């Protein structure tokens, strides 16, 4: 069996889909479905079982067995960069991850987990997986950074696979439940379909991020599991592209609309990453050599998925 925590969420459900595409359906999805809308992410997928996150954590902490586990993909976390309840964030993203990590180490189960580019904070260059480049801007980034630091202490002695992925700006199918935290591409598409002008912040041709398609993210996860490589790796495309490029690809797909530029909100000043670009040196050195979709390629594929019933 394979366990995917956060399996009803955005990246988790895409990992479940990637496993299904390989004929793997003996999957336990762990999640919190208090937000019942997330069920739609699993409707077209095949899994063996579902368990609530709290029940799962109780069983993990009690050392209970789940049969033969081939791997745990740990995508379950609070991923809101605007959540400032530090206790909630540390319980969810740090303590929970530590419990799972030790459970896996004791049983030599491969443990693949979600880290984040938020560990780098507000820097505009040198997004490199090393302590001197890491200075998170919010408690979410700090929770991810601290777990990476914890993993670094353990990696040299570990007898089983531990791999963390620092996700950059992930977008693509199955993120609709994320609301305001969903990608720009998702919001632009919704605005167009509602007959509104799609909106970007003023200066969006100058705001550049490493936008990575979720299908590529799932592919990297599975490749590392299949190849048993350990470490902490950036997971982006290695190419920064502008928010304007995302909008251009969205408008090109819809063949209509024009962008309305809105003032940059004061509350985001100083807390907004103006530029991100993954350094893929370590990822490539580890052996992953497949190309990543450009914004034009990924957004076009995503638009086709979002508008498949139109």
Swiss-Prot record:
Enzyme class: isomerase
NCBIfam families from the UniProt entry: heptose_epim, PRK11150.1
Pathway info: Nucleotide-sugar biosynthesis; ADP-L-glycero-beta-D-manno-heptose biosynthesis; ADP-L-glycero-beta-D-manno-heptose from D-glycero-beta-D-manno-heptose 7-phosphate: step 4/4
Protein name listed in UniProt: ADP-L-glycero-D-manno-heptose-6-epimerase
Entry note: cofactor: Binds 1 NADP(+) per subunit.
Family: Belongs to the NAD(P)-dependent epimerase/dehydratase family. HldD subfamily.
InterPro entries given in the database record: Epimerase_deHydtase, Heptose_epim, NAD(P)-bd_dom_sf
Free-text note regarding domains: Contains a large N-terminal NADP-binding domain, and a smaller C-terminal substrate-binding domain.
Keywords: Carbohydrate metabolism, Isomerase, NADP
Organism ancestry: Bacteria, Pseudomonadati, Pseudomonadota, Gammaproteobacteria, Enterobacterales
Active site (UniProt): 140 (proton acceptor), 178 (proton acceptor)
Function text: Catalyzes the interconversion between ADP-D-glycero-beta-D-manno-heptose and ADP-L-glycero-beta-D-manno-heptose via an epimerization at carbon 6 of the heptose.
Cofactor or coenzyme needed: NADP(+)
Reactions catalysed, as given in the entry: ADP-D-glycero-beta-D-manno-heptose = ADP-L-glycero-beta-D-manno-heptose
Listed PANTHER family: ADP-L-GLYCERO-D-MANNO-HEPTOSE-6-EPIMERASE (PTHR43103:SF3), NUCLEOSIDE-DIPHOSPHATE-SUGAR EPIMERASE (PTHR43103)
EC number in record: 5.1.3.20
Signal sequence annotation: none
């Amino acid at each position: 069996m394979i366990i995917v925590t956060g399996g009803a969420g955005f990246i988790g459900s895409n990992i479940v889909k990637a496993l299904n595409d390989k004929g793997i359906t003996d999957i336990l999805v762990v999640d919190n479905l208090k937000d019942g809308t997330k069920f739609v992410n699993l409707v077209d997928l095949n899994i063996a079982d579902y368990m609530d996150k709290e029940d799962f954590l109780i069983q993990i902490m009690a050392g209970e067995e789940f049969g033969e586990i081939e791997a745990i993909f740990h995508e379950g976390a609070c991923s809101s960069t605007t959540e400032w309840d530090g206790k909630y964030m540390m319980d969810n993203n740090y303590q929970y991850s530590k419990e799972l990590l030790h459970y896996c180490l004791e049983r030599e189960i491969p443990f693949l987990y979600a880290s984040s580019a938020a560990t780098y904070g507000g820097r505009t260059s040198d997004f490199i997986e090393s302590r001197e480049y890491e200075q998170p801007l919010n408690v979410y980034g700090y929770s991810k950074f601290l777990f990476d630091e914890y993993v670094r202490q353990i990696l040299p002695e570990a007898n089983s696979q531990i791999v963390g992925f620092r996700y950059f700006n992930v977008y693509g199918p199955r993120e609709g439940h994320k609301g305001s935290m969903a990608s720009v591409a998702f919001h632009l598409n919704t605005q167009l379909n509602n007959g509104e002008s799609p909106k970007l912040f003023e200066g969006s041709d100058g705001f550049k991020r490493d936008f990575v398609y979720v299908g590529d993210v799932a592919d990297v996860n599975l490749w590392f599991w299949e190849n048993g490589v350990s470490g902490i790796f950036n997971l982006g495309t290695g190419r920064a592209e502008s928010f304007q490029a995302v909008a251009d690809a969205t408008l090109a797909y819809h063949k209509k609309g024009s962008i309305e530029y809105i003032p940059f909100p004061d509350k985001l000043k100083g807390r907004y990453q103006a530029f991100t670009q993954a350094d893929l040196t370590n990822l490539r050195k580890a052996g992953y050599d497949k190309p990543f979709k450009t914004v034009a390629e990924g957004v076009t594929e995503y638009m086709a998925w979002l508008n498949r019933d139109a």
